[in-house]
């Protein structure tokens, strides 16, 4: 449990540095692009799995 608390602390510190450092705008647009890429890949893999079952 303590391990997860430390992991979340490190993630929060990194997010705070990026948020207050001015990189937030660039990283938000990159995250948005990555979200849509992985969403498309998820849908494609889901369709391929359904096609394989039939």
Curated annotation (Swiss-Prot):
InterPro entries: DUF1328 (IPR009760). GO terms for cellular component: plasma membrane. The keyword Transmembrane helix applies. Keywords: Cell membrane, Membrane, Plasmid, Transmembrane, Transmembrane helix. It is a multi-pass membrane protein. The keyword Electron transport does not apply. The chain crosses the membrane at residues 5-25, 28-48. It is found in: Cell membrane. Its main location: membrane. It comes from the Bacteria. It holds the Pfam family DUF1328. Belongs to the UPF0391 family. This is UPF0391 membrane protein pRL90066. The lineage of its organism: Bacteria, Pseudomonadati, Pseudomonadota, Alphaproteobacteria, Hyphomicrobiales.
